[in-house]
């Protein structure tokens, strides 16, 4: 599939903020470091983010563990990102948190100068069945808007290959539409390697009247077992030809890394040619592959 053919199929999106109209947006995702060194829970993040500083990301987001398990680490990492000069964007997941808990976190982030939130249902905490999660991301978006008005831009998740819990693509699209109706101003997708899936998803969204920017999530490939495990857990399709080549390179670490960078670079090139409003990299707190892919794309700086 050529980039030219993809580009001809993508409907234009309607930007909700000035940044969406200035060019492709580059953003990076990190998680709170599991080890501490130097500055408390945030100590391990400095080296990674500073290696990626020259990419001039529009923002750096920080994940929030299942059931709020990394709440303190997320707050510390967000604070450290701000100290290092980055536009920090915390994830919030509703899990088993109360509306009051969420409100307190929103107040904390507002005091830090945060202007954007990634609002998610989040992973189901260990020992908590899905039936006990009476709230979802739509509820969280409504809580954020009720508590903070229009102070925050709100990003939500989107699933070009359909959320694994959804009974059908139509049901999943309805879930997404309800999050947008509740007040979301943009979306970041689950990662994928099939550009057609993204193109078709955006087309269905536009035909359904959903006009927020939908930024594709990008997962670099650096390890066979890791990408297979991630893909199985989140319902992302790892195309057979990619998996076959990764298996052939299992014992050739440099070759596997080079192949992964080449494949993901190609996916990103096709997405940008197709009119994707940006790229959001799931760095897994590693800088090498993300830096190499962005270098291949000529993304030495991103839209501010």
Sequence positions of predicted segments:
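Active-site pocket-lining/capping segments in soluble small-molecule metabolic enzymes
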Residues: 4, 9-19, 132-159, 165, ...
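Active-site-adjacent beta->alpha loops and helix N-cap segments on the catalytic face
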Residues: 16, 39-41, 68-80, 98-105, ...
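Acidic (Asp/Glu)-rich catalytic clusters
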Residues: 17-21, 49-56, 75-85, 106-114, ...
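Active-site mouth loops of central-metabolism enzymes
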Residues: 25-44, 66-67, 88-100, 153-171, ...
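Conserved, mostly hydrophobic/aromatic
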Residues: 29, 60, 109, 179, ...
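Catalytic beta/alpha-barrel core
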Residues: 60-70, 92-95, 118-120, 185-194, ...
């Amino acid at each position: 599939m050529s980039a030219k053919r993809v580009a001809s199929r993508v409907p234009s999106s309607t930007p909700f903020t000035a940044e969406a109209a200035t060019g492709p947006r580059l953003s990076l995702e990190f998680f709170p470091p599991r080890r501490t060194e130097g500055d408390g829970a945030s100590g391990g993040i400095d080296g990674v983010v500073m290696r990626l500083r020259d990419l001039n990301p529009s923002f750096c987001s920080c994940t929030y563990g299942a059931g709020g398990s990394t709440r303190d680490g997320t707050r510390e990492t967000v604070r450290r990102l701000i100290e290092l000069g980055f536009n920090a964007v915390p994830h919030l997941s509703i899990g088993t948190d109360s509306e009051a808990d969420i409100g307190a976190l929103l107040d904390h982030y507002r005091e830090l100068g945060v202007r954007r939130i990634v609002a998610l249902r989040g992973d189901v905490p260990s020992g908590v069945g899905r039936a006990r999660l009476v709230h979802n991301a739509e509820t969280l978006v409504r809580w954020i808007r009720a508590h903070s008005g229009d102070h925050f831009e709100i990003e939500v998740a989107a699933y070009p290959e359909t959320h694994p819990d959804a009974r059908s693509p139509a049901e999943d699209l309805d879930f997404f539409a309800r999050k947008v109706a509740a007040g979301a101003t943009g979306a970041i997708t689950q990662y994928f390697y099939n550009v057609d899936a993204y193109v078709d998803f955006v087309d269905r969204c536009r035909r359904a009247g959903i006009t927020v920017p939908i930024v594709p999530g990008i997962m670099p490939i650096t390890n066979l077992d890791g990408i297979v495990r991630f893909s199985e857990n989140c319902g992302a399709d790892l195309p057979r030809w990619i998996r076959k080549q990764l298996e052939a390179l299992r014992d050739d670490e440099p070759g596997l890394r080079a192949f992964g960078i080449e494949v993901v670079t190609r996916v990103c090139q096709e997405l940008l040619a197709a009119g994707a409003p940006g790229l959001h990299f799931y760095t897994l707190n590693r800088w090498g592959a993300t830096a190499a892919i962005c270098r291949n794309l000529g993304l030495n700086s991103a839209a501010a």
